[in-house]
Amino acid sequence: MGAKNPKIMIATPMYGGMCTGGYALSLLGAWQTLTSLKCETYIATLMNESLITRGRNDLARMFLERDADYLMFIDADITFPKDAIPALLLADKDVVCGVYSKKEIAWDSVSRAAQAGKSNLAEYSGSFVLNMMGAQGDHAEVDESGVIEVRHGGTGFMLIKRSVLEKLKDHVPTYRRTSFRNPETGDYTHPVVHQFFDTSIDDTGALLSEDYHFCELWRKHGGQ
């Protein structure tokens, strides 16, 4: 854990202002655990934002306006154990995420397991939000902190150190949500936002979602 009593901002894009019961109960458990560890915790939600890239960038802006040490993205439909966030903190990585499954069944994996005579087919049904490094395939060894390096991980459950965004600020475009100005003062009605999260096309021609784009951006500028 980088800071002795870290300050954490939990950020949840919440389109339509809705979350699942699993998320709500998980958040209560996490709050209790973090409080017992003397972590100062804030919760920020962004409701009724249909564009996820803009939503995540706005939440990152809110984070940078605070004095928090960590930005913890958690999607509104994620269920997680109460010690999951402390586990990420203990890993002490610049960017680290918890792996969660997609809303689909990996039938190819189930089929291979069945052909191999496996009996516990449910254990092979998950399709997870990550891409492994290079030619690692389906296997990688954990390091001393209990994590593995991946090429891409999901922002549905991702912890980011403040130093990451501070470093990237100089390498990304900025924008305003609108160009509207206050008619009385002439000031812009919305603040400048850094575009940490965007969609992009990588060098293989693959369209990257905003979380995978962020991973590529951080790796491009020396991160891991």
Question: What is the predicted function of each stretch?
Answer:
Residues D67-T79:
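Short beta-strand-to-loop acidic/aromatic patch adjacent to the donor-nucleotide binding site
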Residues D77, D94, Q224:
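Residue-level detector of anion-binding/catalytic polar loops
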Residues T41, D69, D94:
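Conserved acidic residues
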Residues N57-Y70:
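Active-site nucleotide-sugar/metal-binding loop of Leloir-type enzymes
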Residues F214-L217:
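Short active-site alpha-helical segment characteristic of glycosyltransferases
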